[in-house]
Amino acid sequence: MANIKSAKKRISVIEKKTALNRVRKSQIKTAIRRFEDAVAAGNREDAVAKFQYAQKRIYQVASKGTIHKNAAARKVAKLAQKLNGMNA
């Protein structure tokens, strides 16, 4: 356990940021899972709506620094590939 006041504060701040990052990552995973469920069901309109929401959440989380912007782009590209694969 830290003895210095600033170190104690850093521990507290890091715990808060970690919890917030965990929430944000969970939101991304949930959005992706809902999109994939819509794709599996074959419902194109629903899948498009879920894709747009997932894309929005992923880029928001990337802008906050929770995930890297390239990781966000990679996730969105994978989802777009699945969405475009529904046409075939």
UniProtKB/Swiss-Prot annotation:
Binds directly to 16S ribosomal RNA. GO terms for cellular component: cytosol; small ribosomal subunit. GO terms for biological process: translation. GO terms for molecular function: small ribosomal subunit rRNA binding; structural constituent of ribosome. Keywords: Ribonucleoprotein, Ribosomal protein, RNA-binding, rRNA-binding. Belongs to the bacterial ribosomal protein bS20 family. Coiled coil: none annotated. This is Small ribosomal subunit protein bS20. InterPro entries: Ribosomal_bS20 (IPR002583), Ribosomal_bS20_sf (IPR036510). The keyword Electron transport does not apply. Pfam families: Ribosomal_S20p (PF01649). The keyword Iron does not apply.
